[in-house]
Structure formats: structure tokens, C-alpha cells
């Protein structure tokens, strides 16, 4: 399995094998399961993580908080690459929640437009390549 990070996570507490185990396709049957595994990843990195309401979440699925930062996270388990709407949503929703960082996770990559927008807005894009 390959994990490609288009952002930067400074501290790594979970080993690569632990991350690979979390992101096996059998563990990610639904978008909600994908969110739960991303949540576990951030908890492993030492963050306190809370979920937002399923509806009316302002484009943010998870909020990861440490002593120094608050991260807005959106998780997309799409069959196709994620577009710029997800980047706009997590950025604006994160501002609503008072976040200092913004991240979008995908299992099928990102469009060029999403990557370009994320670069301008400083939104981190994380593409999880699942082992088959």
C-alpha cells in the first residue's frame, strides 16, 4: 500500500504498518468508516478529535485539536478524483469553526483544479492509496 501526502504531518506516532492496517479496503466499507479511520490516525498523532453533525457540518467532517492548532478535516470516499468543491468547503467551514489548518482526505486522488486551489488556499490534500 502506498500513502501519498500532499501536505505535511510533522509528527508521526503511528508506524507505517499501523497506518496500512487502518486503511485496508476491508476496513473502509463506507464513507463513515473512512472518517473513523482518519479520526484514529489523528488520535494516534496526539490530537483530540471530534466529529461534526452529519448534516449542517459546513463541509467539515472532523475537527482535530492540539494545544497549538485546530484542523478542519473533510473525508471523501469517492470513486473518482475529488474536485475543488471539497477544498472550498473545508476552507470555508474550517474558518467557521476557527481552524488554523485545513485538510481533505481522498481514496482516489484529486483533480488538477482541486490541487491548484488547495495550493493557493494552503489546504492539505491527503491521497490514501488502498492496497487491494
Where are these regions (language model features)?
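Mixed-charge (Asp/Glu-Lys/Arg
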Residues: 1-132
Amino acid at each position: 500500500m502506498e500513502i501519498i501526502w500532499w501536505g505535511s504531518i510533522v509528527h508521526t506516532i503511528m508506524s507505517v504498518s499501523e497506518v496500512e492496517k487502518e486503511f485496508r479496503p476491508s476496513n473502509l466499507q463506507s464513507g463513515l468508516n473512512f472518517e473513523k479511520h482518519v479520526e484514529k490516525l489523528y488520535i494516534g498523532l496526539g490530537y483530540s478529535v471530534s466529529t461534526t453533525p452529519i448534516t449542517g457540518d459546513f463541509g467539515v467532517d472532523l475537527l482535530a485539536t492540539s494545544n497549538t492548532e485546530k484542523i478542519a478535516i473533510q473525508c471523501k470516499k469517492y470513486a473518482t478524483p475529488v474536485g475543488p468543491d471539497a477544498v472550498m468547503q473545508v476552507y470555508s467551514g474550517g474558518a467557521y469553526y476557527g481552524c488554523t489548518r485545513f485538510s481533505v482526505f481522498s481514496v482516489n486522488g484529486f483533480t488538477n483544479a482541486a490541487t491548484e486551489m488547495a495550493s493557493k488556499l494552503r489546504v492539505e490534500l491527503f491521497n490514501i492509496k488502498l492496497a487491494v
